[in-house]
């Protein structure tokens, strides 16, 4: 079997939705050695101060850092052992002929072209999906690709001389600087994968960091504590590929019973909520359930899948964009920590009604993304209202805030029961 291709940046964040999918197919134990648990964010201010912000209140509310390459290798090895599945590498699906239901393929090893009959076709060919683009000009999918004016480059902090971590290993490290940020995620070997997110152009953009002097000056000003830990800083910043950040949204994901878009081909999102992989794995869980219910009635299967998941994908796409602003900017505001403290207090008092939006997304696989977004908007307004004139949690009228939660948010079990009734 061919090795899984690396070449892509940004460590993956495995959360409840992804773990749920891996457990359902029985391979979570294979993935476990690759995982590094993270309890929260370590925010590094420009003046050297650090603040640790927990993701959740319970000890089991963790997010796991995992390298893309390691996870890909295990998933491909498992797939390779399935008797009726054949893996073909370096075969590029370059288009789709709807009337004939055939995929046009180019063999990248020799440039030869051939066709494959596909009835139906599950198209999981990425954000730049050629299958999806084959329908451009029609109303079949209505795909729209939107790029951020920001990009990213991968850097690294090696393990220390004794193989030790040079930063706390149980945190996602963020250095927020308003319009840009540097993040670091731990790997099992004691090293960290860093990702530098910057505007593509402008004063503090990749375009202006064009030589060693500009890179060194930039890091000395904005990331003075990180620069000494990155031995290949200039080489990596100047020579590593610049990654793009974008969102794919579609009006539809299927062409009757013929084609179904899956994963990034249907709903690529920016990485700032760590949910792209988790959303794709959730797709698999949902699709498996619907296929079990309807077997090979593909028009019904595809329509049901779209009806249940498309709005959720749009919701997490929005929340991921929101989280970019939070990570690079809002998290620096003392009010952010106060709102988080109030959210935790309300969750303690009313766990059946108030779950922070971040926790709903990351730790509650049974709460749809759309529900998390909708409840999160109500909660955000409530948190803003009760902290607007407060300087600490002691200044907040907690009883009044709890009463407001009861008035504005139905019990979360009511939502769960409604969803179960609709699916049955």
Language model regions located:
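General small-molecule cofactor/ligand-binding pocket signal
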Residues: 86-88
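Catalytic P-loop NTPase motifs of RecA-like helicase/translocase cores
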Residues: 2, 130-131, 268-270
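Active-site-adjacent segment of FAD-dependent monooxygenases/related oxidoreductases
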Residues: 3, 7-78
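Short, solvent-exposed loop/turn segments at secondary-structure boundaries
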Residues: 6-9, 205-210, 272-276
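Conserved mid-domain beta->alpha element of the FAD-binding
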Residues: 122-123, 155, 241-332, 368, ...
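Conserved FAD-binding catalytic core of PHBH/FMO-like flavoproteins
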Residues: 77, 82, 91-95, 100-245, ...
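C-terminal helical "tail/cap" subdomain of flavin- and related membrane-associated enzymes
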Residues: 289-424
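Acidic/histidine metal-binding catalytic segments
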Residues: 33-37, 223-238, 295-304, 313-318
């Amino acid at each position: 079997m061919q090795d899984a291709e690396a070449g892509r940046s940004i460590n993956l964040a495995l959360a409840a939705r992804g773990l749920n999918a891996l457990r359902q197919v029985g391979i979570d134990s294979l993935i476990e050695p690759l995982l590094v648990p993270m309890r929260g964010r370590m925010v590094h201010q420009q003046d050297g101060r650090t603040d640790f912000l927990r993701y959740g209140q319970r000890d089991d509310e963790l997010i796991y850092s995992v390298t893309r390459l390691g996870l890909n290798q295990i998933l491909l090895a498992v797939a390779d052992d399935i008797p009726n599945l054949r893996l073909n590498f370096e075969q590029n699906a370059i288009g789709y002929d709807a009337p004939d239901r055939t995929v046009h393929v180019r063999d990248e090893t020799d440039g030869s072209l051939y066709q494959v009959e596909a009835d139906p076709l599950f198209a999981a060919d990425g954000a730049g999906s050629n299958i999806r683009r084959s329908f451009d000009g029609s109303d079949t999918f209505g795909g729209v690709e939107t790029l951020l004016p920001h990009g990213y480059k991968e850097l690294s902090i090696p393990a220390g001389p004794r193989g030790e971590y040079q930063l706390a290993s149980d945190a996602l490290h963020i250095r927020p600087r308003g319009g840009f940020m540097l993040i670091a995620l731990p790997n099992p070997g004691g090293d960290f994968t860093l990702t530098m997110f910057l505007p593509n152009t402008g004063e503090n953009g990749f375009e202006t960091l064009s030589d060693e002097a500009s890179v060194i000056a930039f890091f000395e000003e904005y990331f003075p504590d990180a620069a000494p830990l990155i031995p290949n800083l200039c080489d990596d910043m100047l020579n590593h590929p610049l990654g793009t950040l974008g969102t794919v949204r579609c009006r539809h994901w299927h062409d009757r019973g013929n084609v179904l878009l899956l994963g990034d081909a249907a709903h690529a999102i920016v990485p700032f909520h760590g949910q792209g992989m988790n959303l794709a794995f959730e797709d698999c869980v949902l699709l498996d359930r619907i296929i079990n219910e309807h077997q090979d009635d593909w028009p019904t299967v595809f329509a049901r899948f779209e009806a249940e998941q498309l709005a959720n994908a749009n919701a997490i796409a929005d929340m991921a964009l929101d989280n970019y602003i939070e990570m690079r900017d809002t998290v620096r505001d003392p009010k952010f920590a106060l709102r988080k403290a109030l959210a935790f207090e309300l969750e303690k008092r009313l766990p059946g009604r108030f779950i922070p939006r971040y926790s709903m997304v990351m730790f509650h696989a049974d709460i749809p993304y759309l529900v998390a977004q909708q409840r999160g908007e109500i909660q955000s307004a409530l948190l803003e209202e009760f902290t607007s004139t407060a300087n600490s949690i002691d200044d907040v009228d907690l009883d009044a805030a709890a009463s407001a939660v009861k008035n504005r948010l139905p019990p979360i079990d009511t939502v769960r029961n409604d969803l179960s009734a609709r699916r049955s």
